[in-house]
A protein has these predicted regions:
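Intrinsic disorder at enzyme termini
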Residues: 1-21
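N-terminal capping segment at the start of a domain
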Residues: 24-33
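Gly/Pro-rich turn-and-neighbor structural signature
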Residues: 35-51
Length: 143
């Protein structure tokens, strides 16, 4: 068991301590999983995280401290569980904040773990390096 004394630091509230304890208990009962088929393991983890209510911690209602506690706890028990959680958030984060009504229809499914979010990007000079993307505006005739 890892040292949890940091949860008593003044910037953690009781809700953070409750979250950490509840997730720790969930992890003990559900993790680690068999990684022999990584694709199946990821699908199963997303479904289990959704069924456990852990994917509800997303979008505008999620504070950074809660996000850190969730990711640290999942990663300590099973790195693939942290990956599955992070990818659901990365894939739907922009949709939860800025998505169209049609795009937002996917939020309940991804939070329930019945749909898997995706995040894809390619840029000529950065490939899949999100931090290296850039936007250039060029004035064109007629627009």
């Amino acid at each position: 068991m890892s040292d949890k004394s940091f949860l008593n630091w003044p910037f953690f509230e009781q809700r953070h301590r409750d979250l950490a304890a509840a997730l720790e208990a969930w992890c003990v009962n559900h993790l680690p999983v068999d990684h022999s088929d990584v694709d199946a393991a990821c699908r199963g983890l997303v479904a289990a995280l959704g069924a456990g209510g852990w994917l509800q911690h997303s979008g505008g209602v999620l504070d950074v401290r809660s996000l850190c506690l969730i990711r640290e706890t999942l990663a300590r028990h099973d790195g693939l569980a942290d990956f599955a959680f992070a990818m659901q958030g990365l894939g739907m984060g922009a949709v939860s904040l800025f998505g169209s009504p049609q795009q937002r229809e996917w939020l309940d499914k991804t939070r329930a773990g019945s749909a898997i979010a995706a995040f894809a990007l390619t840029e000529p000079l950065s490939g899949s390096d999100v931090a290296a993307t850039s936007t250039i505006a060029e004035r064109v005739q007629g627009g």
